[in-house]
Amino acid sequence: SRSPQPAGPPLLIAGWGDRLLRVAAAHARIIGFTGAAAARDGGPLLLAGERQLGERVDFVRGALGERASEVELNLLIQRVAGDGAAATELFETYRPAMVAEAAVDPRSVPTLLAGSPEAAAERLHELRERFGISYFTVLEDSMEAFAPILARAR
């Protein structure tokens, strides 16, 4: 495993663009995906859908070459909500910040996790199966909502 220092922890580099992901592929043991794509017109970042995440994962795998089996993939979960009204509010709040195809089906946005703890845990398993993501980062304001999901996802 690669680390920034011989006895140090594995290096994690996270990003979305080609340049940073190439650096990550060359040096990191853990490669994180932020899940937000820069608008081509210089506008605000947009939450990516599954297609965009798949493209980024494929790009990284291509850049890793023979190192692919040595590297763990990480995804930043931007927000976690329960089901019902909480999920609806989450998706409506973030809909303007999604790429167009993801806004049609906000539940397909990999970085937003909503639903019952069982459904959310199943979603994490789906992301692992489909994209090979085995490491998830959750922001502090979603940690309590994530706790029952974690218990079911193990």
Please give the residue ranges for each predicted region.
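Active-site-adjacent structural elements that line small-molecule/cofactor binding pockets in enzymes
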Residues: 1-154
